[in-house]
């Protein structure tokens, strides 16, 4: 679609022209007003009861001489008086409530039990490290398959140096005499690790005169399909491979005649291709599938199970921290118009980094996402146009005294909580890390400016004339700029000031992330949102720009998403080969993109959180059976 290149050159905090408001679409991170919740409160599998969140909130906030009930009642009375003149939301209460405050895993019955798990995992790590070292004498296919298995099982972070050495060796292998399955896996592995390998050179010999490929079985098709999803602009052979393999894989349905694990892989890949999937969300399924493979290694399998359970215990402790923080803010007792989704926020951000070493970064990022969600609902549901304008100016000032008597009590309350939360981040950072907060605040301010623009659009019923104009603001209001920056804030020394300056400039890979998310969200949500009052989406701008009906606009938007993925892949390769940024940082951006794809592939699983309830339960509650 023409015009998107202009968006790729947008700058942070570039204010839209005041004469014609440049679109302020709902953030991609969270949905807009008018979205109807399909949520049903359900008990988790295997539990006898399900806790609801206590209405009294966490500690603090009760004046001397008053009871928690008095404070809660007063807040409720003030809210009810205010609510009559405002929009209302239909968001359901949290599914999870305080569940993780009291949940005790069957794996954590004693410190001795956990110590035994850790000890056994350390033994297995040493044995698997020897296995990796010995694989250098094995076939290329065997080495690729081993690395692929370790990555799918979320074990690669335990063997980072060993895997990097092996990938370097694999890169130097001549694959001209290999079969399609091996070549496709080789290409996928190297592209995924940031190596710019030629597609024409390795895949040309597998093409036929009809434009197809010499794929002899479903596994060949699947591997070629995954490889093709890492294509960049101008790679015609991979465009053809993607089209060919997609059609062939779909034609194989219902897959009843093939191995169950392969059938599951194909179904998942057609929903979300492997390079765009969130590994930790599907790790438990892949552990089970790996265990059913004839070439599975028992040491790798046992380590995968133990490591999954140990990581799960770490995540459970962090969920206690997150839930307690959310309760202590007392947001759910005063702000009934907003979504209570703190567990879903944490689930989302675990996809950005699941590894135990990123605990501080993960907790900070989850809290910021919860704040983003609250801000979105404040602009989208609660505030009037005038109030949102004042609220934006208050946040721009970053001064608690700026609220004066002009803002509603709830907006003052929210502003104070944002300041308190950011101060807590700063207190947690080391002296030589505190500069990071400047970048975080800058992106929060830019986000609320974009939110404020969308309020103006909604009030005016304005539809941007082009998709490019729309994205000048809606790509910013998606929150991905802020989350990209925040993903660095809690990391270690690897995130230096050069990295923050890089992300402050909103590099092309982050812009591509923002566009992919905005368009994917609008593509999924248009039919639902048009039934209620909402901010114009990119779908409407596309129809207006090209004077086409809805179905044609859908095709154009999908084409733009596909082309933007090529931009993303190109930048992934450029940054891995031509920049000084550590891959550890670049992975945060790629993983953030993957989580966005997952959430919006599910038709906004953040708001419609029943969609991911079972996945959350599987990831954070149910351990993997070791036997």
UniProtKB/Swiss-Prot annotation:
Primary enzyme class: lyase
Region Disordered, annotated ranges: 13-90
Transit peptide: 1-53
Reactions catalysed: (2E)-geranyl diphosphate + H2O = (S)-alpha-terpineol + diphosphate; (2E)-geranyl diphosphate = (4S)-limonene + diphosphate; (2E)-geranyl diphosphate = gamma-terpinene + diphosphate; (2E)-geranyl diphosphate = beta-myrcene + diphosphate
Tissue and organ distribution: Expressed in seedling leaf sheaths and roots.
Signal peptide: none
Induction line: Induced by wounding in roots and leaves sheaths.
Binding annotation for (2E)-geranyl diphosphate: 339, 376, 380, 518, 521
Binding site for Mg(2+) 3: 521, 525, 529
Chain positions of motif DDXXD motif: 376-380
UniProt free text on domains: The Asp-Asp-Xaa-Xaa-Asp/Glu (DDXXD/E) motif is important for the catalytic activity, presumably through binding to Mg(2+).
Function in brief: Component of the volatile terpenes biosynthesis pathways. Mediates the synthesis of a blend of monoterpenes. Converts mainly geranyl diphosphate to alpha-terpineol. Also triggers the biosynthesis of minor monoterpenes including limonene, gamma-terpinene, beta-myrcene, terpinolene and 4-terpineol.
Protein name: Alpha-terpineol synthase, chloroplastic
Native source species: Zea mays (Maize)
